[in-house]
Amino acid sequence: DVVNSQAGDTLPVSSFMPYVDGTMPAGTAAYEKRGVAVFVPQWQPDNCIQCNTCAFVCPHAAIRPFLLNEEEAAAAPAGLKLAQGKANLKDYKFALSVSVADCTGCGNCVDVCPAKEKALVMVSALDAQAEQENFDFLNTKVGYKETIVNKAQSVKNSQFAQPLFEFSGACAGCGETPYIKNITQLFGDRMMIANATGCSSIYGASFPASPYCTNSEGHGPAWANSLFEDFCEFGLGMKLGSDRIRQTIAEIMTEGLDCDKASDEIKALFKQWLENKNNPAVTREVADKLVPLMENTDCPHCKKLLTYKKFLAARSQWIIGGDGASYDIGYGGLDHVLASGENVNI
């Protein structure tokens, strides 16, 4: 990468034209592979109780649990350690793997491991290089089986979901990033984030490295940064703007129910969306079915709706700021936004 090679001043203006609106490519932090850790955790499967607490506290999403079926386990690299899944996951093989090149060596995972004999021990990063191949295989070939468990039920289940915030440039042992990472595992495919200037804006959007990424379906958090003094109002504005767009969608769909050029299938999906427009699961399902149909019809209402297709799935608005923004210069806005009763998360 030209910028990471400190040769960004050689780039022509034309290189930046796709990003004149302030956007930047998602998931680019995954390509940095800084390899800054001297020591990294190594999994001891015989001691592991498979609680996933280590992954839960990892500031950089560098240690992750994976579930493998029989075919995936058979295709795994020879050096990959596997254990039999426990309880309702006994039909799967369980693996805990570390991205050695992305780990910062903070040791948080080892500290929180509740096993009587620690299931993680710190070893030289030089001696653990082979683990990177295992992690890459699990991350790209096996993936995340978050649909076979209720990821919102427990810490353990949540960690089987793909983090949509990974490998940021936050300090080793950061206490902020685990919260963001875990929120993206629960809501990331439909999140909008209003961020206050501070650490979260540095590790969250230092061009060209973005730790916010997308899942296999291309869905991920939308992130924007504001100042200390108005971060809550900024987030409330994002929520109100999204609500107005979705109100427009509802109006177009209501009119579309009487459109002769809309098929019965499209009208049924319109009706389902209108009845469940604030239900995340239903609206995502409807959107996945509806968009391809609307792209292949002459219905004028469908053509209008395609402009707003990214807003079909119900969104989850988050507002993230530090102590200075929340308790000092931005408290007035925080107080008013909380009092508004709007459905935002701070």
Question: Where would I find each of the regions flagged by the language model?
Answer:
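Active-site substrate-binding loop specific to GH73 endo-beta-N-acetylglucosaminidase modules
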Residues: 106
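Ferredoxin-type iron-sulfur electron-transfer modules and their immediate structural context
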Residues: 1-102, 110-318, 324-325
